[in-house]
Amino acid sequence: MGQLGALLHLVDPTLPIGGFNHSNGLETFVQQGKVNSRASLEEYVQTQLMQNWIYNDGAYLSLAFDAMANHDLGRLLQLDQELAASKIARESREGSYKLGVRLLKIFIRYENHPLLSEFQQAVSEKRCQGYFPIVFAMVAQAMNLDKAETLYAFYYNAAVGVVTNGVKLVPLSQMDGQDILFALRTPLAQAVENSLNPDLDWLGAATLASDIRSMQHEQLYTRLYMS
């Protein structure tokens, strides 16, 4: 039960890290009329899951989890730098490392793991940025959480964020949002299975539509979100 409690704390939407401030380009998709219904929002989140997250944030989380288990700080720093290079849009890039640094600041108070302290020092010395998936993986492994459950929680948390923002932006009913999340159960499990041992040839695969909308978001006349 202790591990379940730790995992729930890690994905708690009330964590004061500012995740609710980011749409990662979804706001642009909505303003352009690309996402305008329950069906299009469901297609959007499933596309993000199976064509973006499993090759980017989820894959890097998986690799960072293994590096943390091997006490390999050098590999963690390398993964953080590679993830930085894969995040083309400035707002999404900055948003991710701000979330990561805040998450680390919270959980380093509870987990006495030397790599967390060393990584925080590396962030302070600007040897890395501290991207959210990397820090999430490090904290989860420091708490001895199961890798598959960590990946599922990470993906579910990301999906909830997209659906919550989509329901607000389109707008849709709360029940529409719940139906979308229910339909994600099988895709989420598949994404976890695909991410346990990421295919390095697909690491950082481009997501052009999302990257373009994320960059266009900087120029929107009105917006609710920071990315």
Curated annotation (Swiss-Prot):
<comment type="subunit">
    <text>UreD, UreF and UreG form a complex that acts as a GTP-hydrolysis-dependent molecular chaperone, activating the urease apoprotein by helping to assemble the nickel containing metallocenter of UreC. The UreE protein probably delivers the nickel.</text>
</comment>
<keyword id="KW-0996">Nickel insertion</keyword>
<keyword id="KW-0143">Chaperone</keyword>
<dbReference type="InterPro" id="IPR002639">
    <property type="entry name" value="UreF"/>
</dbReference>
<dbReference type="Pfam" id="PF01730">
    <property type="entry name" value="UreF"/>
</dbReference>
<comment type="function">
    <text>Required for maturation of urease via the functional incorporation of the urease nickel metallocenter.</text>
</comment>
<dbReference type="GO" id="GO:0005737">
    <property type="term" value="C:cytoplasm"/>
</dbReference>
<protein>
    <recommendedName>
        <fullName>Urease accessory protein UreF</fullName>
    </recommendedName>
</protein>
<dbReference type="InterPro" id="IPR038277">
    <property type="entry name" value="UreF_sf"/>
</dbReference>
<keyword id="KW-0963">Cytoplasm</keyword>
<dbReference type="GO" id="GO:0016151">
    <property type="term" value="F:nickel cation binding"/>
</dbReference>
<comment type="similarity">
    <text>Belongs to the UreF family.</text>
</comment>
